[in-house]
From Swiss-Prot:
<feature type="region of interest" description="G4">
    <location>
        <begin position="136"/>
        <end position="139"/>
    </location>
</feature>
<dbReference type="InterPro" id="IPR004541">
    <property type="entry name" value="Transl_elong_EFTu/EF1A_bac/org"/>
</dbReference>
<feature type="region of interest" description="G2">
    <location>
        <begin position="60"/>
        <end position="64"/>
    </location>
</feature>
<keyword id="KW-0378">Hydrolase</keyword>
<keyword id="KW-0251">Elongation factor</keyword>
<dbReference type="Pfam" id="PF03144">
    <property type="entry name" value="GTP_EFTU_D2"/>
</dbReference>
<dbReference type="InterPro" id="IPR009000">
    <property type="entry name" value="Transl_B-barrel_sf"/>
</dbReference>
<dbReference type="InterPro" id="IPR041709">
    <property type="entry name" value="EF-Tu_GTP-bd"/>
</dbReference>
<feature type="binding site">
    <location>
        <begin position="19"/>
        <end position="26"/>
    </location>
    <ligand>
        <name>GTP</name>
    </ligand>
</feature>
<dbReference type="InterPro" id="IPR004161">
    <property type="entry name" value="EFTu-like_2"/>
</dbReference>
<protein>
    <recommendedName>
        <fullName>Elongation factor Tu</fullName>
        <ecNumber>3.6.5.3</ecNumber>
    </recommendedName>
</protein>
<keyword id="KW-0963">Cytoplasm</keyword>
<keyword id="KW-0479">Metal-binding</keyword>
<dbReference type="GO" id="GO:0005829">
    <property type="term" value="C:cytosol"/>
</dbReference>
<feature type="region of interest" description="G1">
    <location>
        <begin position="19"/>
        <end position="26"/>
    </location>
</feature>
<dbReference type="InterPro" id="IPR050055">
    <property type="entry name" value="EF-Tu_GTPase"/>
</dbReference>
<dbReference type="GO" id="GO:0003746">
    <property type="term" value="F:translation elongation factor activity"/>
</dbReference>
Length: 396
């Protein structure tokens, strides 16, 4: 079959492999790129190429991640694979690689293991919306009943963490056999089956521009005779001249109207997701708006002070704290563009948190922040990043 030119016209989806160490995440990643490149074009990557993951920084945290891409019949996928467990934890908490869905790799020979559980929990906490399972190493299991047993265990585990275990696609195969070009059910055909499951089970994500307008406030100026201009990068949605806007966070929510949008000193009739713009606000005084607030479509986001979060605490080697912290620890939480002090409540039975740990906590901020589940933040002490987190559930 002739390789067609690599086209960007297909919808773009972000995925990644998760699962226990040595269950075959990287081998599967290599197999997917190789098998799909043969059929749909794109670049095959070897195990060694994927395994030598380069370092990258996200929110002041160094993470090793490999990025590959591949085509299926319907879509173009960007796929992340991490070499170590700590890299997965950091990746998922910082949102460095935002996933529209995850491929959970479980060894059919071993069944679910501690990190299988931890990655499913993390996926739930950080808002990975869909999981598909690849039961790997099926060539090492002769007993069909054992395969069924492992499949049942995986489904139960997914259901336990509020994923639809009974409806989750589970593909049985051997990534190694697929890499070797094996044509039996567990070889190459299992990769096509996985690709078809990705295409049908993970819905196309909403594009940023289709969301409700949101723009974090970076700077505020007053222009004599024109009013107050707020600058920032539009995170999602579109803002048009004449539309109502709410100013949310830090202070009581106020309403105003957008009377102008400018970009590179030119006036526009609208600004959209990704644009760095200045938004002119009617009748708003300069001191009524500050960095750390957001401009938003009315009624779409609310300010909160108390929430549960999944956090990762940097190790000493990563430039983090050298000592553990305890109940009532009060660092700054950096949301979007500003720091807000808050107190951390540890879960029952947890005395302290060591550098390098990840933990579920409850946070009480001293001032409200425009917040929704899945919002990322950094934890800082005097401007130095000591951790990262993601809002799991809003309390008040």
């Amino acid at each position: 079959m002739a390789k067609s030119k690599f086209e960007r016209t297909k919808p773009h989806i972000n995925v990644g492999t998760i699962g226990h160490v040595d269950h075959g995440k990287t081998t599967l990643t290599a197999a997917i790129t190789m098998v799909l490149a043969k059929k749909f074009g794109g670049e095959a990557k070897s195990y060694a190429q994927i395994d030598s993951a380069p370092e990258e920084k996200a929110r002041g945290i160094t993470i090793n991640t490999s990025h590959v891409e591949y085509e299926t019949e319907k879509r173009h996928y960007a796929h992340v694979d991490c070499p170590g467990h700590a890299d997965y934890v950091k990746n998922m908490i910082t949102g460095a690689a935002q996933m529209d869905g995850a491929i959970l790799v479980v060894s059919a020979a071993d069944g679910p293991m501690p990190q299988t559980r931890e990655h499913i929990l993390l996926a739930r906490q950080v808002g990975v919306p869909y999981i598909i399972v690849y039961m790997n190493k099926a060539d090492m299991v002769d007993d069909a009943e054992l395969l069924e047993l492992v499949e049942m265990e995986v489904r139960e585990l997914l259901s336990k963490y509020n994923f639809p275990g009974d409806d989750t696609p589970i593909v049985i195969g051997s990534a190694l056999k697929a890499l070797e070009g094996d044509q039996s059910d567990i070889g190459e055909p299992s990769i096509y089956k996985l690709a078809a499951a990705l295409d049908s089970y993970i819905p196309e994500p909403q594009r940023a521009v289709d969301g409700a307008f949101l723009m974090p406030v970076e700077d505020v100026f007053s222009i004599s005779g024109r009013g107050t201009v707020v600058t920032g990068r539009v995170e999602r949605g579109v803002i048009k001249v004449g539309e109502d806007i709410e100013i949310v966070g830090l202070k009581p929510t106020t309403k105003t109207v957008c009377t102008g949008v400018e970009m590179f000193r030119k006036l526009l009739d609208q600004g959209q997701a990704g644009d760095n713009v200045g938004v002119l606000l009617r009748g708003t005084k300069r001191e009524e708006v500050e960095r750390g607030q957001v401009l938003a479509k009315p009624g779409t986001i609310t300010p909160h002070t108390k929430f549960t979060a999944e956090i990762y605490v940097l190790s000493k080697e990563e430039g983090g704290r050298h000592t553990p912290f305890f109940q009532g620890y009060r660092p700054q939480f950096y949301f979007r563009t500003t720091d807000v002090t808050g107190a951390i409540e540890l879960p029952a039975g947890t005395e302290m948190v060591m550098p390098g740990d990840n933990v579920s906590v409850t946070v009480n901020l001293i001032a409200p922040i425009a917040m929704e589940e899945g919002l990322r933040f950094a934890i800082r002490e005097g401007g130095r990043t000591v951790g990262a987190g993601v809002v799991a559930k809003i309390i008040e």
